[in-house]
Amino acid sequence: MTNLEKILVLGATGNIGFTVIQTLTAAGYQVRAGVSNPEKSRALWQDNDLVDVAHFNFLDTSTYPAALEGISKVFFVRPPQLSTPKEDMFPFLRFLKERQIAHVVFVSLIGVEKNPVTPHHKIEKEMMRLALPFTFLRPSFFMQNLNTTHQEDIQKHDDLFIPAGNARTSFIDTRDIGEIAAICLMNTPQHIGQKYSITGKEALTYYEVAEKMTAILGRKITYSKPSLLRFRATIIRRGTPKAFANVMTMLYFITQMGNAKQITPTAQELLHREATSFDQYVKDYREDFG
């Protein structure tokens, strides 16, 4: 049975957004996928009658009306390249307020309440100031960062080039986050105003991550433990924009301070199953690591 509500999913082609759409449409919900390149993305859902595709760009307010037409609820993540929320994201939040959207699910960051310099903190604060009907998902570091952001170093050098020191990280699988977001959107009343800190079931050092990857992939993976400054300089030299490099470096500094090691039962409570294990993630994404 098709649900008459229509939900806008932004970042629809990303790790989280794609799972949000899969979960919602499996339950009969109509979804609009907001994407930067509709022509390229349309093929992803050509066999799914519950998905329509619309052009959307946070920086282009002219894309807002058509994307939001007939929409009751919204899911969004902050595109990593947008690091100045006041200019990049606030116009969109104000538009949601004008449209009286019934529920807005935002993927934030664990520990964000203690880190006012992060873009996520500023977005949360503005959403609360506008009195948007929010749910904040505050995940720990994504397992999928390893097969995206850090993929090249693993493929080419068998190395985790990540400035996390000896700190532990309670990694979460983005597929779990996407499923949780969909659960919240399908059960709006009980999730409005909630701020969920979402983690996996274990907190690992990157030495332990390297050991697990070595065992599963069948080749030696090392953890070189670069300094924050060396990491930042290296990724900028490789072409990462400075603003994005600064945010990444700041997040790993937060990790070094011990703020990524927290383990919560929230994922299991919302999913009604255990969170995906790190070992399972590596097995599922084995081909991405070369």
Feature names for model-found ranges:
Residues 196, 212-257:
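Terminal hydrophobic/aromatic helix or amphipathic segment near a protein terminus
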Residues 79-159:
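Glycine-/Pro-rich loop/turn segments that contact NAD(P) or position catalytic residues
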Residues 146-152, 184-195, 261, 290:
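Glycine/proline-rich active-site loop of Rossmann-fold NAD(P)-dependent oxidoreductases
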Residues 168-175, 199-215, 229-230, 276:
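Substrate-binding strand-loop-helix patch
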Residues 163-184, 194:
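Substrate-positioning beta->alpha
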Residues 4-29:
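N-terminal Rossmann NAD(P)H-binding glycine-rich loop of SDR-like oxidoreductase domains
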Residues 54-71:
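Conserved Rossmann-fold cofactor-binding substructure of NAD(P)-dependent oxidoreductases
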Residues 266, 271-290:
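Amphipathic terminal alpha-helices
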